[in-house]
Structure formats: structure tokens, C-alpha cells
């Protein structure tokens, strides 16, 4: 993308987004950075600027296997650039209601749940989700009572739970 090309010659290019967000993050409860599924410079910037990363995984065998590469990248970012970065959770997307997909979902929870928090939210594959990419509105406005909106609502509550845990300080617990 043009932004990634523009970052090539920038000093400390891995932390451009982090430096920008430092100036505005006090204005927000949460800042969510939604990135394309790649490991380019924009994703590296997002990881260097984040406290937590949520990992969406398509509910198929190969995508679940590829998740280990992203986990390795998160560990590298934590060691080299952002020691605060944690994996907030893994959630499954594009999950059709078939036995095969249910097996994938169960396998991800069983195999990765030992090492990573696997979120309860499972985002279904629906026509409505495909439609919103051209509708210029969220699934909550497009089909507020649909399966996808309910699943994303569950995900939002889980993300809020991560944020609430972060806000609790040891002094608050001791009281």
C-alpha cells in the first residue's frame, strides 16, 4: 500500500503509529486498530502501538496452522519493540454451521487454549457480513438482530472484559 511504501525511509518506522497515538490516547477508553491479515509494516506499527492483540482465525485447518506464525511475530515484537504487548485472545471467524467447522472450532480451543486465551465468540460466515463491506455501515446497523451481530456483540463484551481487567490495579484489589 502507499502508506507502507511511505514508511520505508522513515526513521523508527516501526513506531510511527505508536508515537501518533501517544498524543491522543487519553481522549479514548479504547483504540481498536483493525489490520489486514498480513505481516507488513502497518501491522508491525499496530502491534508496536498496542497493549493487546486479538487474533482472528478463519475456522479452517490451514488458517489455524498459520496462526503460529503470527504468534511468533507477536513474541518478536514484544522482545524487540513493545514489551507490554500481550495476546488478549484468539477468536474464530467465517465459521459455517457444519460438522467440519465445529470440529475446527473445537480443535482450536483444545489445541491452542492451553497456551492462548480462546474467546467464546465465534463469528459466523453470513451473507450479511459480505454485504456490509459495500454497505458502508456496521453489522449492528445493517442487521442488528442477526447471528453475526450477536456474535460480534459477544466479542465486544469479551474485549471490554480485557479492558476492565487492565484497569484494575493491585492497590484496588488489596482494598
Describe the residue ranges of each PLM region.
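P-loop/Walker-type NTP enzyme "switch/lid" segment
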Residues: 1-26, 81, 133-135
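Short amphipathic alpha-helical segments at helix-loop
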Residues: 2-5, 54-59, 140
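Generic structural "secondary-structure junction" signal
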Residues: 5, 9, 41, 63-64, ...
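Conserved phosphate-coordination/catalytic loops
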Residues: 11-15, 68, 146
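Charged catalytic carboxylate motif
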Residues: 16, 69, 151-154
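Residue-level signal for well-ordered alpha-helical scaffold segments within enzymatic catalytic domains
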Residues: 19-23, 45, 154, 158
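Conserved catalytic-core segment of NTP-binding enzymes
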Residues: 22-124
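C-terminal lobe/tail of nucleotide-utilizing enzymes
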Residues: 79-175
Amino acid at each position: 500500500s502507499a502508506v507502507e511504501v511511505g514508511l520505508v525511509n522513515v526513521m523508527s518506522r516501526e513506531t510511527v503509529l505508536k508515537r501518533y497515538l501517544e498524543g491522543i490516547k487519553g481522549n479514548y477508553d479504547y483504540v481498536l486498530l483493525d489490520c489486514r491479515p498480513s505481516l507488513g509494516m502497518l501491522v508491525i506499527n499496530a502491534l508496536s502501538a498496542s497493549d493487546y492483540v486479538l487474533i482472528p482465525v478463519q475456522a479452517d485447518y490451514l488458517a489455524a496452522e498459520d496462526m503460529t506464525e503470527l504468534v511468533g511475530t507477536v513474541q518478536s515484537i514484544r522482545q524487540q519493540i513493545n514489551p507490554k504487548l500481550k495476546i488478549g485472545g484468539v477468536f474464530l471467524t467465517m465459521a459455517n454451521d457444519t460438522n467440519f467447522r465445529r470440529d475446527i472450532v473445537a480443535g482450536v480451543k483444545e489445541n491452542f487454549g492451553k497456551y492462548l486465551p480462546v474467546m467464546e465468540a465465534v463469528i459466523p460466515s453470513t451473507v450479511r457480513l459480505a454485504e456490509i463491506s459495500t454497505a458502508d455501515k456496521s453489522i449492528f446497523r445493517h442487521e442488528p438482530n442477526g447471528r453475526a451481530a450477536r456474535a460480534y456483540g459477544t466479542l465486544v463484551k469479551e474485549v471490554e472484559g480485557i479492558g476492565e481487567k487492565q484497569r484494575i490495579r493491585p492497590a484496588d484489589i488489596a482494598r
